[in-house]
Regions:
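Short alpha-helix
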Residues: 32-46
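SAM/dcSAM-binding transferase cores
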Residues: 63-108
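Helix-to-beta-strand junctions that scaffold the AdoMet/dcAdoMet cofactor pocket
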Residues: 18-23
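Conserved S-adenosyl-L-methionine
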Residues: 48-58
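Short Asp/Glu-rich motifs
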Residues: 40, 62-63
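Mobile active-site "lid"/loop adjacent to the S-adenosyl-L-methionine
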Residues: 1-16
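Conserved beta-strand signature within the Rossmann-like core of class I S-adenosyl-L-methionine
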Residues: 13, 24-31
Length: 108
């Protein structure tokens, strides 16, 4: 379901997520900050409960993405919002970023 814009509209993507998601399942979507309202509206229209799970920053001041948490029920939606910062003030990767990607990259 990655790169939905190539094949599916936001509305169609939410319909597919709803159809494929188990009643106790979780879906996490990495979305642009500019698309958040569209995703939240589309999720609500198909009956998915949603919560912004994580805000992703390129650096300490530049918000670039959100991780949206979707479920069929709202019982297990986490109420806290996490922050994830890729680069620090020295433009070096943060420990958080390195730790998250260490299994995928050899030299960070």
């Amino acid at each position: 379901m990655a790169l939905h814009q190539s094949h599916l509209s936001v509305d169609e993507l939410m319909q597919v997520v709803f159809f494929m998601l188990r009643s106790n399942g979780d879906a996490y979507l990495l979305i642009s900050i500019y698309e958040e309202e569209n995703f939240i509206k589309a999720a609500s229209l198909v009956g998915l409960k949603n919560k912004r799970y994580q805000a992703i920053y390129d650096n300490e001041r530049k918000l670039i993405r959100y991780v949206l948490h979707l479920r069929k029920d709202s019982i297990h939606l986490d109420t806290r919002e996490e922050t994830f910062i890729i680069r620090d003030s020295k433009n070096e990767y943060t420990e958080q970023f390195v730790d998250a990607l260490k299994d995928f990259y050899l030299h960070l």
